[in-house]
């Protein structure tokens, strides 16, 4: 069957290749869509063309469209809906189009998981599955795994004669727990689920270990990867020797070295030849390997630089060959085979444990009526296929044939991120073979960055290699290489790098002409859009810093450099092209994104940017569990679950919930020094109080224990969500945190905890203990309950995000930071490794000697995984570079720039475009790749120094490369610190610091200088009456009374834990004012009734117990028996705690001298009481100053003192009332509760 392509309409906006992707049919089609090539638009247009065609149109529900995310599915439905509306506007009478709009909501446009769920709900009767099943929460699944693992291992430990199991435990667990074995079982189980037949895959793990002494080691699957690695290393060694030989033969070169170098070259060539022969011969040849000594080169005829360089190249070659001898080929083949035979029972035991776990776990999920996302795929696969009884091969089931008949075409977006199980499902619902099929796949394997989620990019690559442009041999492939996103400079720069970096062995594909990005946009000329590379030179030895500290400093330095550049971009300004208006506009903060490999150092970056006045934000999902309010509530829940936990209990008591101070906690601990803190608390409540402080603490302890008992009872009887909300109500904690800074976010955090409790109880688990364990699992996994605030597109901030998060997005200006950060290779050194092809491999542990060493399969998987990791990192770098529309900045921070450049220079003279495999494979960071590529460019600038091939050096890309000294970024503050370090150290050590005599007079003059307008410094725009009173005292009025005593030595207060807790006079005064404000003036105001009202105020938490004890009910009762008190009770109008604000001239308040006569000050205050009776308005201010003892009962003296101290305040009060209320104040009084007398204020 020939491929069919409808002719492109005249005037179409689509390129020829895009139209081919839209219109081609009749077979399976793979569209390799480069970044920015409009693949989503092409996919949508293909669907629109199919459903709106005037002839042969299909219904939208006869298409299966599979997307990578739910958001992508929703966007695609929206785009299709808009296109249908536009088409309907042109053809308003089309019943077919109206039908498509009605079918669209139910169309099969979804993620593959959603499609699987629909299949399962339709055919659930073919499975042993309750139709009311639900999809389990991820953490619920983790908890269930734990339970099943515990049950499995308990059974294994209980079996008699289970020697194999105990051998596994001894080999792969620590002395104290079997956590490592549990992790191994779960890792193998989850990895197996990415295979269409997980049980068969597990059962076949031992096949690689089916060897005997006659096995040819070269025939083993593992040997292929070992040989590939050896060939790469030997080729690299031969190339290094060749370059050393070229140096030896140069004028001034170490010519005596030439003969020895030729011998080395021949020896390495011989080893390369032996790679294709028996393994034993190669092992013997490497064992007998010997690099001879180089002859001496002395005299003026020889260039020392060339001598050193030649030696260095030979040493590098020796290291590579000797590493092969000492590692991969260190053992005789018979020894490798013996280890594999000894490993077989170990691997078989582990595989059987995983298979048993899989059965038990599946049964546990079925019992609870739950499935996970992996189950969706495998249940769907089970429904869609059946095994042919004769051939044993899988065939489409009747259900699959129904779907094949239902769907005219199956369209898959982001095909490069498909896994093996998903591929099997797609192959079952599509029709025909590749040559006659209806599978349409769109993706870009260069953007496949989800291998850690077990995506398999080789599925895409395999089809890309097999399919042809005309589709005659099978499937058809279409390359969409035109990029409509980026400026030419960005594309040229990206192409320049990847033409040198991405290859078949290292990179998994060749970055050839078809893969290169073609300029398709229409940007106007103008801005300098050349990519910029900035390398910060820290100029220090690597060992000076610990890795974490060095990384932290690198992030700070890079953030400072980015801040400097961002300021230039925004203020210079840099212009970006606005497609909506078709005009350039000034760049804004929202046009800029900072991309990083991980968010570890994002907080430091944000801090540095904001310190420079640059608004910055990042989607930081961490920190929820560290929030104070959440920490307190989780501690309270832990105490309710089990009060015998000292740390949570102490945290709760010390928190704002119960406000125990350190003295009270010490009293509690002393009540029972050896028991738990809870036991001490119970003992403390029961012991006789010896002091007032102890009695008060005991009341608090009793109240807490009573509440705790009630909450524990509630936890047993009611739901967890009800308990949490009741805690919020009982403690008023929800309202309390709302009044703190960031109160809305704090309350949102508490609501998130409540919501999570409700979600938890909708799962198969119940109870407070399990919930707390659930939370612990979340914390261990790094999950977070608090959703980060999503940023709106129009928020004018610089965004910081990971490269993975940026996939599918585009930004005018991109900063790619942290390029020198090493690749994460820790997983390659795990005691066991997994691979889809090679299976399971682990270190061999000698049962008697307890020594472990790598096995051949482990070395093979390590080699394979390292190349896969490098390919993934290369694709991640590609994604990052292709996010930029107009400007790209690449940043890195290194310890020694000169040393790094020297390391890269060897790449400059390499022939051809693609750098050798070993050069690319030896990279430890993105910077290693970029540096080795840029050093070959004419714009290498700071990096250049060696002649590169002309075809590479003259590439049309333009670069700006700069080495930035870190000192330029550390700032003036750091420079001062460095300069003054000796002086600061001398001061810290108490040594004399030398002074320069020339400055002494100036220092003295400055110290003795007095400000001419000192009084003006006390003038504020807003001032309280009490502050005004104190300032008047300070500047003269009542000066003798208030001036501090001179010449006394400072007296330091005792530490708080040694102080006796008493209220200050001000605190006592506040307590009395609270009582006077809340008393019911119509009640019988005698002493006993006032005392009962004080108790009520304590219960309402308007007063503390200490404050209540400081209030004298008899003094208050005396006031109400006096004439002024009786008038207050009988008044027709009473106002208590009257606030006011009054604008006055500064000169009037402070005196004319030293103040601006026209300046005004806002005076604020609160008047204790104003009432109105037949005499008019009467004003009272209550005073609690201790005057009786001070003036020995002389009330006249006391009255004069109070008038002098508060007269100004009262006159301001009177003036405020009269101006604001526009009514005269007839009488004005001070009432002193100490002595019970009234002072009239004129």
Swiss-Prot record:
This is ATP-dependent helicase/nuclease subunit A. Belongs to the helicase family. AddA subfamily. It comes from the Bacteria. Keywords: ATP-binding, DNA damage, DNA repair, DNA-binding, Exonuclease, Helicase, Hydrolase, Isomerase, Nuclease, Nucleotide-binding. Heterodimer of AddA and AddB/RexB. ATP binds at residues 33-40. GO terms for molecular function: 3'-5' DNA helicase activity; 3'-5' exonuclease activity; ATP binding; ATP hydrolysis activity; double-stranded DNA binding. GO terms for biological process: double-strand break repair via homologous recombination. Residues 514-808 form the UvrD-like helicase C-terminal domain. Its cofactor is Mg(2+). Gene3D superfamilies: 3.90.320.10, 6.10.250.2380, P-loop containing nucleotide triphosphate hydrolases (3.40.50.300). It comes from Geobacillus kaustophilus (strain HTA426). The heterodimer acts as both an ATP-dependent DNA helicase and an ATP-dependent, dual-direction single-stranded exonuclease. Recognizes the chi site generating a DNA molecule suitable for the initiation of homologous recombination. The AddA nuclease domain is required for chi fragment generation; this subunit has the helicase and 3' -> 5' nuclease activities. HAMAP family: AddA. PROSITE patterns: UVRD_HELICASE_ATP_BIND, UVRD_HELICASE_CTER. Its EC number is 3.1.-.-, 5.6.2.4. Residues 12-487 form the UvrD-like helicase ATP-binding domain. InterPro entries: AddA, DNA_helicase_UvrD-like_C, DNA_helicase_UvrD/REP, P-loop_NTPase, PDDEXK-like_dom_sf, PDDEXK_AddAB-type, Restrct_endonuc-II-like, UvrD-like_ATP-bd. The keyword DNA-binding applies. It catalyses: Couples ATP hydrolysis with the unwinding of duplex DNA by translocating in the 3'-5' direction; ATP + H2O = ADP + phosphate + H(+). GO terms for cellular component: cytosol; DNA helicase complex.
